[in-house]
Amino acid sequence: MIMINYLVNRMDFQMASFITSGLLVIIGLYGVFFVDNVLKKIIALEILGSGVNLALIAIGYNGGTIPIKLPGVSVEVFAKESAYPLTHALVLTNIVIEASMLAVMLGVSIILYKKYKTLRSSVILKED
């Protein structure tokens, strides 16, 4: 426990976010490639997407303030101290795309279950 506290104190927010996003991506890839259930694969894809979103947020993190121009702050100081807004816009776009993909994947999984009476991908692939 002492070692974990030491690492947390020595690590900054951006590095912790990169490590967490890497772990989420690894967990998501493991679920996509090695899990047999279709619903669990969908959950793994969502975890993978969350890891990518967290990595994008960590890339845009600047350690400064939120990207809102306050009165009395020069443009140079504002640009130097604010977070990078493009990565945040990409994450918002990615969340919308992931939500629509989730709806389609769940719809396809319902159709697969009605046709094959199972959600195990090995059984579904053998029957085709």
Swiss-Prot record:
- Which InterPro entries does UniProt cross-reference here? CPA3_antiporter_subunitC, NUOK/Mnh_C1-like
Question: Has the keyword Membrane been applied to this entry?
Answer: yes
Q: Name one GO biological process term.
A: sodium ion transmembrane transport
Q: What GO molecular-function term can you cite, just one?
A: sodium:proton antiporter activity
Keywords for the protein's UniProt record, in alphabetical order: Cell membrane, Membrane, Transmembrane, Transmembrane helix
**Would you tell me the Gene Ontology cellular component terms?**
plasma membrane
Where does the chain cross the membrane?
A: 13-35, 42-64, 90-112
What's one Pfam family the UniProt record gives for this protein? Oxidored_q2
Q: How does it sit in the membrane?
A: Multi-pass membrane protein
Where does the source fall among the domains of life? Archaea
Where is this protein found?
Answer: Cell membrane
Assign the protein's first listed, main location to one coarse class: membrane
PANTHER family of this UniProt entry? Answer: ANTIPORTER SUBUNIT MNHC2-RELATED (PTHR34583:SF2)
- Designated name of the protein: Uncharacterized protein MJ1310
Q: Which organism is it from?
A: Methanocaldococcus jannaschii (strain ATCC 43067 / DSM 2661 / JAL-1 / JCM 10045 / NBRC 100440) (Methanococcus jannaschii)
